[in-house]
């Protein structure tokens, strides 16, 4: 059975901290009690030496964390310091004295202190606003306001609707490209359209991931739908790059990753310009070139044949060079490839035949 300590990261991140603050967790219960009580709070999620060095006054103790204890201790003006695993309350009513040289965009005293403490120590800090009844998390140099579960659920459901439309459109362009590949009439714009839709699906899925983290156990149904809509998109993104990235020989994992990161680095407007995707692939980025024919190496199609692993795909692509040569090869020619053998050769040729 895992404990809170088991999931603690070596470096505090927004993602991990949001998971610790999800509805239903003891810490979120304590924060919700503070909000309902209309009192402010300043809570530090860690008692490392760089935290204790900026603590002044208050009192030290070491008691088991409880939501009710946190609520009562936060009635005092000072900050509350928890252990790094959040299991114990270490200090209360302390004044935090971070360096004023740290930049902050906050106006309230409590929030300015929270942001500067998080920046200086690298430890997550929470500020609860007494006047606005909001919970703000500071970590990784960023701030994030925790929202009500009902608000998050509505947003996640809206995003799922968007993702469903993206999935439908991706399936359409994917099918069109698949048929074009098999019948030797694929063009640059066919490839670009699939990459664009795959990236759009990835982005909206990433947004929903954050909602799922914040919702915690209340996101079970959202997670099921997200997994279904996402499908094999991450793997397929890599295979289409492997099929069409212009390189000498077979693309390496490193070059594929670089191309994927370049696509992910485009803003939404730039993503919708086909020339930008073509340029990343190493293809001519002109409008005229978008209708030029392209020939896949065969990774996407081989991925549709059950149980064919990436290392086997590399061997086949390395031997035959492209999908057309591969689909034209006999069982004997495929079985002659090092590491394939007759059983796999028959399985692969039968699988390719069914796809065509």
UniProtKB/Swiss-Prot annotation:
Keywords: ATP-binding, DNA damage, DNA repair, DNA-binding, Magnesium, Nucleotide-binding, Nucleotidyltransferase, Transferase. It comes from the Bacteria. Its EC number is 2.7.7.85. Participates in a DNA-damage check-point. DisA forms globular foci that rapidly scan along the chromosomes searching for lesions. Also has diadenylate cyclase activity, catalyzing the condensation of 2 ATP molecules into cyclic di-AMP (c-di-AMP). c-di-AMP likely acts as a signaling molecule that may couple DNA integrity with a cellular process. It catalyses: 2 ATP = 3',3'-c-di-AMP + 2 diphosphate. The gene is disA. Belongs to the DisA family. Homooctamer. HAMAP family: DisA. This is DNA integrity scanning protein DisA. It is an enzyme of class 2 (transferase). Residues 11-149 form the DAC domain. GO terms for biological process: DNA repair. Coiled coil: none annotated. It comes from Corynebacterium efficiens (strain DSM 44549 / YS-314 / AJ 12310 / JCM 11189 / NBRC 100395).
């Amino acid at each position: 059975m895992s404990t809170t300590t088991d999931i603690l990261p070596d470096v505090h991140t927004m993602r991990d901290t949001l998971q610790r603050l999800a509805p239903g967790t003891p810490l979120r219960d304590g924060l919700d009690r503070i909000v309902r009580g209309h009192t402010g709070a300043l809570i530090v999620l860690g008692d490392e030496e760089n935290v204790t060095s900026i603590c002044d006054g208050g009192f030290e103790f070491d008691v088991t964390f409880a939501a009710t204890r946190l609520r009562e201790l936060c009635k005092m003006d000072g900050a509350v310091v928890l252990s790094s695993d959040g299991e114990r309350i270490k200090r209360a009513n302390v004044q935090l004295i971070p360096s004023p040289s740290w930049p902050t965009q906050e106006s309230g005293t409590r929030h300015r202190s929270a942001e500067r403490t998080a920046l200086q120590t690298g430890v997550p800090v929470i500020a609860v606003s007494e006047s606005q009844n909001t919970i703000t998390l500071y970590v990784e140099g960023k701030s994030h306001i925790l929202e009500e579960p009902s608000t998050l659920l509505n947003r996640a459901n809206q995003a799922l609707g968007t993702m469903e439309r993206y999935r439908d459109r991706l399936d359409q362009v994917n099918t069109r490209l698949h048929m074009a590949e098999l019948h030797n009439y694929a063009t640059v714009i066919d490839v670009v359209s699939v990459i664009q839709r795959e990236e759009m699906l990835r982005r909206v899925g990433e947004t929903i991931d954050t909602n799922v983290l914040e919702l915690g156990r209340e996101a079970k149904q959202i997670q099921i739908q997200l997994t279904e809509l996402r499908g094999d998109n991450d793997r397929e993104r890599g295979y289409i790059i492997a099929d069409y990235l212009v390189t000498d020989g077979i693309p390496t994992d490193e070059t594929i990753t670089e191309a994927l990161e370049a696509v992910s680095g485009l803003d939404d407007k730039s993503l919708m310009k086909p020339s930008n995707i073509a340029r990343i692939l190493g293809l001519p980025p002109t409008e005229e070139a978008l209708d030029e024919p392209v020939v896949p190496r065969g990774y996407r199609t081989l991925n549709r044949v059950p149980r064919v692993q990436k290392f086997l795909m590399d061997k086949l692509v390395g031997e035959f060079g492209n999908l057309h040569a591969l689909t034209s090869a006999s069982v004997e020619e495929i079985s002659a490839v090092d590491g394939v053998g007759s059983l796999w050769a028959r399985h692969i040729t039968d699988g390719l035949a069914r796809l065509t």
